[in-house]
Amino acid sequence: AKSPLSLLAMLLDNRNDEISPSLQAKLDYVRSQLQEDVTQMLYYARLKSSTKDYQFKDINLNDCLGEVLEDYAPLLEEKQFVIINKLQSETVYTDRRGLQFMLGQIVSNAIKYSSDSPMLTISMIHSETADILSVEDNGIGVKKYDLPYIFQKGFTGDSTDSRKKATGMGLYLVKKMADDLNLHLEATSQWGKGFKIVIFFPKLRSNGGK
């Protein structure tokens, strides 16, 4: 059986020529918002489950990111985001669905707290012990005294209009998923200038082991 969201998607796609471009854009935007809410609920349940179905394998990071950006395209286009993707052909060893969920929540966070000329920069550096993925935006950022609490459940920080509407679940779920996948997270921010989140993928197999 098809879910209501997939039926909505099919209806929008099939009736594309009957809907004005502006209405189509608005409906795509609403669909993306609904999809994100459903995704959060599903992963919240998954993270609390005693049986996990993670599949660890080498993942092409660019492919993974591309799918996430495609999912969020209506929201990114609505805000007129500029995406700067500096990734090459890197692979990381992790669970694909889990990583895509993390990246999706990080992108969603950047959209919610974006500036007037929003930009998202994705890059990677390599150290001896880890591959380090950085996702940086130029949005409103987080105040210094709030930064230690951003991964706490329900945290929304300063009471700006956009934060008043937030649930405070996105980055909490990112941290929970990172813990499950044995990934380390770090976040830095300058209030009014942007927010950066860094994911460390440990080089676990450098000596032939996993």
Identify the role of each PLM range.
Residues 49-54, 87, 91-97:
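Conserved micro-motifs of the catalytic ATP-binding
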Residues 75-84:
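Short conserved segments within the C-terminal catalytic ATPase subdomain
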Residues 110-111:
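Short helix-loop "hinge" at the ATP-lid/N-box region of the Bergerat-fold HATPase_c
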Residues 117-129:
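Short beta-strand/loop element within the Bergerat-fold HATPase_c
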Residues 137:
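Acidic ATP/Mg2+-coordinating residue in the GHKL
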Residues 142-155:
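Short conserved segment of the HATPase_c
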